[in-house]
């Protein structure tokens, strides 16, 4: 069996992780392997994990999740040699250019799947025209062979129509699918069955999803690490106040009741929910804050300082 290799891109908070989790739950026919930069960001449901071996997590439904720790060539060579996969999907960094990953789809032993870019259905136009990150988002949308508008269940019909129109201004001939939170499988099967244009030869130089020309100069991140339990609702309230300054925030916190919560900020909205591993090992909590613009570093540091004061014992700040 020859697997197809597809690329998933999209700006920070556009819904890539939600898409990846749907794929790992078996949204596509046959076995799927997803290649990511960091296992921790995917938040795989503990009930789905059959085994974990180094950089590979095997799931009970036959799908696997791989973390890039060496070179892209090594990872794809190993996956192509398995012979039991129908789909391989590589995630590109939220500030990366998925177009630069497109040539990997001609890797020996694989066939080319589509280059899919996620766009936030609630904030697409704002991001496409943002003073600081608009160029990044427009490049991602322009590179897409298929666009997936996410979070449409959180948007009004007018907002969804405006998001679609904004995307078509940048990519007028690119098909756009509306995500269906209730039934993601049907939409994803249509997307990953899309026709693919001719692909240039795969690069031989080392690299991986993280090497895809990200716009690091525009973005700055700071991590807040708590050493004692955190009130997730209080943290969420402070993130809501900071939503105009940050383009993304994501992490997990351990509450006083011993339950671990996933907390994230995307598109100006804050979400708090129990983590897939509700009673995850360890007592630390951490949240990554990302700002964009010429003063991104200072903005991220100020936001981190505010959040660090939420516990009696000062939190640790890390780049």
Tell where the protein language model's regions lie, with residue ranges.
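C-terminal accessory "lid"/substrate-recognition subdomains
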Residues: 146, 152-286, 291-319
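Conserved beta-strand/loop subsegment of P-loop NTPase cores
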Residues: 33-34, 89, 111-120, 139-152, ...
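Short amphipathic alpha-helical segments and helix-helix/interface helices
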Residues: 24, 91, 102, 138, ...
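Short glycine-centered, acidic/aromatic-flanked micro-motifs in structured strand/loop junctions
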Residues: 10, 22, 150-151, 291
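Nucleotide-state-sensitive switch-loop elements of NTP-binding domains
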Residues: 2-135
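Short glycine/proline-enriched loop/turn "hinge" motifs that connect secondary-structure elements
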Residues: 109, 139, 277-281
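Alpha-helical scaffold elements adjacent to nucleotide-binding pockets in ATP/GTP-utilizing enzyme cores
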Residues: 75, 100-104, 140-143, 162-166
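Helical mechanochemical/support elements of P-loop NTPase systems and associated helical scaffolds
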Residues: 4, 68-71, 97, 133-140, ...
